Amino acid sequence: MTAHFPFDNSYVALPPNFFARVAPTPVAAPRLIKLNRPLAVQLGLDPDLLETPEGAEILSGNQMPETAASIAMAYAGHQFGNFVPQLGDGRAILLGEVVDRNGVRRDIQLKGAGRTPFSRMGDGRAALGPVLREYIVSEAMAALGIPTTRSLAAVLTGETVLRDPIQPGAVLTRVASSHIRVGTFQYFAARGDLASVRALADHAIARHYPEAAQAPSPYLALLEGVIGRQAELVASWMMVGFIHGVMNTDNCSVAGETIDYGPCAFMDTFDPKTVYSSIDQFGRYAYGNQPPIALWNLTRLAECLVRLLADDDDKGIEIAQTALGGFAEQFNAAYLAKLAAKLGLFTSQPDDQQLSQEFLTALAKGEADFTLAFRRLSDAAVDPSDLGEVRALFADPAAFDEWAPRWRARIATEPQDATTRQAAMRRVNPAYIPRNHRIEAVIRAAVDRDDFAPFEEILTVLANPFEEKAEFARYAEPPQPHEQVLETFCGT
């Protein structure tokens, strides 16, 4: 029986300069590592069929579903501030789109499926390590409630890829609301192709912002919609210590999802200057720089839309600048509301922002673990007089000791009872995140020993990040000094 993919493809209806038609390059011996069965069901796919050898053939790119329209998408992008007029899918091939059980259109893409016209000097392949990292982190982000691309499957290819060191090859099946990036708009704008910019904007409105079509200025509504989603997204990143690592405009999703996990990492000890990515030598994409970089990326999008916002360039620029001016307010509102909730502040008082920021200052001064400090504060919410477990996380607790009495006094003014407050705090302060040293251990077991049991276990743990279980206690702990991962790599 043939695995059925109910593709309903819309992107291929756009002009041919938007993509290149390309077939995946076959692999030697595909072997399914993991299928995301709940996601498969949500997409209207048959997980039992996908777990057969035929399913592995499809998920590796060896066989194409009948209704697939496999393409590599064209886009440009600013990489670390430098504009590259042509990038495109160099190792990813979009099989097609399905409408899921919630009526949402989703892309299904094979990452590591072989060379495309956009591959430049690359081999079009993916190594096992980065595939496992993206699978783990994207699914963890989904469980944390943060908009993200998803991972449907991971498949070994039976081949090796030339990396340093040589690694087993793998293919990731990625699912996204779309793969339209800021860089997609830049690709056409850089060529002076206003007709294609307009066609892309119309497509993005129809797919992601249908309400914008009824607005007095649909293209302004599109820009404002993307600004709002990015503000909310990056605020959510900040709440879990997530560092994307490579916030280039080609990695900025117009749909407002986290995309392209590459050298991403989660911060252990709180420090706004934290950088893990080996290619971010000057800290452009450090944890604390992510909000202004998001605005920088959105400004590049606005530049592409100026001629759609008004016939006169000066007027279009003025309209765009006004829209961009709303980012800071939207980000700050989302950020401060989320941060207050993490501290158990569910009503608003004038000094809440200062109290919240002072806790972050105490974390930095005390070199405390970001995730664990908030979680232990949640645990202490029932009896705020005993903050011993929180205090023990601080190498230097002086700033925390100064802050703690003010927090106790503030939460005493909250209307809910202590048990309700604790439950609410635990719903926003995860016990488990994909800690870098845990991911590295999973990758080493898989790459070095062909052992995927640790991979399965970490997925189980991270599927319920807010539910603490004694048997998973080690996953909540920060790394020991010898376990610390100080640098992450893109893997391309």
UniProtKB/Swiss-Prot annotation:
It catalyses: L-seryl-[protein] + ATP = 3-O-(5'-adenylyl)-L-seryl-[protein] + diphosphate; L-threonyl-[protein] + ATP = 3-O-(5'-adenylyl)-L-threonyl-[protein] + diphosphate; L-tyrosyl-[protein] + ATP = O-(5'-adenylyl)-L-tyrosyl-[protein] + diphosphate; L-histidyl-[protein] + UTP = N(tele)-(5'-uridylyl)-L-histidyl-[protein] + diphosphate. GO terms for molecular function: AMPylase activity; ATP binding; magnesium ion binding. Keywords: ATP-binding, Magnesium, Manganese, Metal-binding, Nucleotide-binding, Nucleotidyltransferase, Transferase. Mg(2+) binds at N251, D260. It is an enzyme of class 2 (transferase). The active site is at D250. Its cofactor is Mg(2+); Mn(2+). PANTHER family: PROTEIN ADENYLYLTRANSFERASE SELO, MITOCHONDRIAL. NCBIfam families: PRK00029.1. This is Protein nucleotidyltransferase YdiU. It comes from Rhodopseudomonas palustris (strain ATCC BAA-98 / CGA009). The gene is ydiU.
